[in-house]
Amino acid sequence: MSMQTAPIKKITLSHLQAKKNQEKIIAITAYDALFAQIFDPLVDVILVGDSLNMSFFNQNDTLSASVKMMLYHTKAVCAGAKTPFIITDMPFGSYKDEKTALKNAIRVYKETQASAIKLEGGKEKAKLVKTLTDEGVIVVGHIGLMPQFVRLDGGYKIKGKNEEQQKKLLEDALSLEEAGVGLLVLEGITTPIAQTITQKIKIPTIGIGSGKDCDGQILVWSDMLGFFDSFKPKFVREYLKGKELIQNAIQQYADDVKKGNFPNELESYH
């Protein structure tokens, strides 16, 4: 009689770390219960990203996202997705010092069912990471192209193109690992250094625009499902023409209403 493994009820950090060098981690963003529920059986990780400020609220960058906003959307995602490991982005300004970071991270844990918080920054954030992990908070790191630094950097610029940047990225990764981050997001860095970092550190890397050698991949759902046609980053693969499909459906609905074809007898009460 063959032994069957029981299905995982909730993916934990241990499950994800066990995938290192074994099986790719599948991650996606979500901002509400509806899409979180759709994604639930298909992904390992859901990130409630501050990217919602751009894709959900149509802002130019992520910087005006607030803790209140992130808590609201994290609650919604947790209501829809029961199995994936759920990560909440700490928005700009919410971890400017240890006291502020602890206060906001503890709020995330107390007010939502999030599995972890994510913050941007390299070795300069190592002390903060240790403080948070010492309090029982799972921290996900994020290095490379960091959207919260877009104004300082003068735009969305790929990192790791020269030796100095590559050295810094590796130092950042090693420092964050030592400080206790459970996972590390690599965004917008060149493939060779992403591969090196993935090989050098023991925790899983999740890439976005950082080549295929990372331990996992993440995309913003509205990018990969074709909801934005004004701009598409090079690293995005579009798996659906979502905007077009929905507009076609709404057009059919509008046509039916105008022609008196909706509602029909079967869709009416008597």
From Swiss-Prot:
SUPFAM superfamilies assigned to the protein according to its UniProt record, in alphabetical order: Phosphoenolpyruvate/pyruvate domain
Binding site residues for Mg(2+): D50, D89, E120
Sequence positions that bind 3-methyl-2-oxobutanoate: D50, S51, D89, K118
Record protein name field: 3-methyl-2-oxobutanoate hydroxymethyltransferase
The protein's Enzyme Commission number: 2.1.2.11
Species whose genome carries this gene: Helicobacter pylori (strain J99 / ATCC 700824)
Family annotation (NCBIfam families): panB, PRK00311.1
One term of GO molecular function: 3-methyl-2-oxobutanoate hydroxymethyltransferase activity
Localisation: Cytoplasm
Complex and partners: Homodecamer; pentamer of dimers.
Similarity comment: family membership: Belongs to the PanB family.
Reactions mediated catalytically: 3-methyl-2-oxobutanoate + (6R)-5,10-methylene-5,6,7,8-tetrahydrofolate + H2O = 2-dehydropantoate + (6S)-5,6,7,8-tetrahydrofolate
GO cellular component, one term: cytoplasm
KW Ubl conjugation (keyword) present: no
Membrane-crossing residue ranges in chain numbering: none
Active site: E187 (proton acceptor)
Entry-linked InterPro entries: Pantoate_hydroxy_MeTrfase (IPR003700), Pyrv/PenolPyrv_kinase-like_dom (IPR015813), Pyrv_kinase-like_dom_sf (IPR040442)
CDD domains from the UniProt entry: KPHMT-like
Keyword Ion transport part of the UniProt annotation: no
Cofactor note: Binds 1 Mg(2+) ion per subunit.
Cofactors (names): Mg(2+)
One Pfam assignment: Pantoate_transf
Pathway connected to this protein: Cofactor biosynthesis; (R)-pantothenate biosynthesis; (R)-pantoate from 3-methyl-2-oxobutanoate: step 1/2
